Amino acid sequence: MKYQQLENLESGWKWKYLVKKHREGELITRYVEASAAQEAVNLLLALENEPVRVNVWIDRHMNPALLNRMKQTIRARRKRHFNAEHQHTRKKSIDLEFMVWQRLAGLAQRRGKTLSETIVQLIEDAEHKEKYATQMTTLKQDLQALLGKK
């Protein structure tokens, strides 16, 4: 395992995940009967500040169909949490209009690169073009100065 598991922190994430799914209308308990399901949900809501007991609740009451999705969500959250500690692994987001994103994605696909690699390549291309334009302007000025002096 690449990232260390932090039980208290992850239990809080699990609690938030389950409460969010419940509020979205998903069945988070294994119970078919509405009263038993509501009782289990009320018990979960009472566990907000008791992260260790959230895992016990999950073992006893959670809908087994939700287990895999929750594990994937927690694994992704753990990765983002640890990557955020270091500047070079921290992810940034930028707002792009859909058409811009679509063109960038198409270019990345044609070049066989990721979006980030494509953006870096575009920046480097622009920098080279700028440098070339500056060199050409300087060369032109030098040439005019040489021809003008004679």
Curated annotation (Swiss-Prot):
Q: Name one Pfam family in it.
A: MatP
The protein's matches in InterPro entries, at most eight in alphabetical order, are given as: Arc_rbn_hlx_hlx, MatP, MatP_C, MatP_N, MatP_N_sf
What subcellular locations does the record give? Answer: Cytoplasm
Annotated family: Belongs to the MatP family.
Q: What does this protein do?
A: Required for spatial organization of the terminus region of the chromosome (Ter macrodomain) during the cell cycle. Prevents early segregation of duplicated Ter macrodomains during cell division. Binds specifically to matS, which is a 13 bp signature motif repeated within the Ter macrodomain.
Q: What are the protein's UniProt keywords?
A: Cell cycle, Cell division, Cytoplasm, DNA-binding
Q: Which species is this UniProt entry from?
A: Salmonella typhimurium (strain LT2 / SGSC1412 / ATCC 700720)
| Gene field | matP
Q: Which Gene3D superfamilies match?
A: MatP, N-terminal domain, Met repressor-like
What Gene Ontology cellular-component terms does the record carry? cytoplasm
Q: List the protein's name.
A: Macrodomain Ter protein
